Amino acid sequence: MIMILLNIILELILIVILLLTLYKSYNNKTRECKGSVIGNRKLKEMFPNFKDDVAENGIDLRIGELYIINKKESDHNGWVGCVDDEKLPPSYAEVKKEGRDHYILEPKNYYFAKIDRPIHIPKGHIQQYYLRSTFSRCGLILTDAIGDSDFNGTLMLGIYNSSPVQVHMGFNERIIQAVTIKTDGTDISYDGNYQNDKIYNEKRNLGQ
């Protein structure tokens, strides 16, 4: 009888330990998720030059300039890591406004949207970029991109019109939402070709 009671007590203790472990694990996951995405109040402090474009959980980015890559506009193919490890994207040309009040994105064409102003991502944070749903419903696709910690410069993101029809888009339109995420253990700052817009100053990358 005593052995049966001891076994029951031991099983109860093991159940309690298991429940405590699960509870602790749940709390840790909740704590990790809580506050990882920066909300609108903090965003206005972190990005004062975008405070008028702060949404609920992100920043709405506007197009400043639009560029196109296609066979007609590009004078060479793209090269990455083939010749002396040089990175040479296809040249691309600015989409001219030509007196219109909006851009026209032609079917099955790939574009670069240059954001209308520079952005600085604070150290210890990254950004993820998403196409606003209105444009997704028009058949546009935003290429995957992450803004690295301590990046400073003007973003240029790829957009593809996958639809069989033209998409008309107003100048300076809010098209992309940037979600800012706090990271743990980040001690490396971005120092690539796009830092401080240095690559945009090379004529070959603007099709000039």
Residue ranges and their predicted role:
Residues 4-208:
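DUTPase catalytic domain/fold
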